[in-house]
Amino acid sequence: SRVTDKGKTYVHACANGDVETADKVFCVDYFNSEISVISIVKKKLVKCISHFKLNGSGKDPVKQAQPYPTYVGFLPDEDKLYVVCLGLDQVCFFDVGEDGTLTLDNVHTLQLEPGCGPKKMIFNQKGDRAYVMNELNSTICVYKYDHLNFELIQTIDSYPKDDDPELVSSLSDIKFNSDDSHLYAINKGHDSLV
């Protein structure tokens, strides 16, 4: 099914369950700095029931002039929604009401290095490690994770930056293989898969 939400530019979405149990889809709108909630009834998208507008800006006056949410998901051990925001250098957390209302968790925010431009956060299968892909500085931050507590344990460059310091490159995507033994990253500009 299809739902029209005029003027929206959704770049990523997730549901609050599998195809049998989900009753909501959560979408991030990159250009309008919003998170939208769409209801599902009998496995069909029905209508947009809620919006939440992010505010602020980041270090880079061009690429971070406003919030740019890029990824949405659920924490592995909580019923909290998380939104990765390239424009704010943050991962924000939300409580979701039965009616789809989103409430920003003002206590828990994962603040990243200014100007790094996070684009995606994924978890290993055990749910005890979080991997944040930073588009603007081409790094991956690895966190030990436990119930809304994130402890940075490693930051990795996604390509050898010393080889060509003038190269303009950005990290495009990260993904685990099927058993979590390898994390793959794609670089635009450096044009590499690592």
Residue ranges and their predicted role:
Residues 28-60:
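Flexible glycine-/small-residue-enriched beta->alpha junction loops
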Residues 37-47, 94-102, 143-151:
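Short loop/turn segments immediately following beta-strands, especially the blade-tip
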Residues 142-194:
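A beta-strand-loop signature enriched in Asp, Gly, Thr, and Trp
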Residues 81-138:
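Loop-centered beta-sheet repeat module
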Residues 3-24, 55-78, 112-127, 159-180:
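Beta-rich, blade/repeat-based domains predominating
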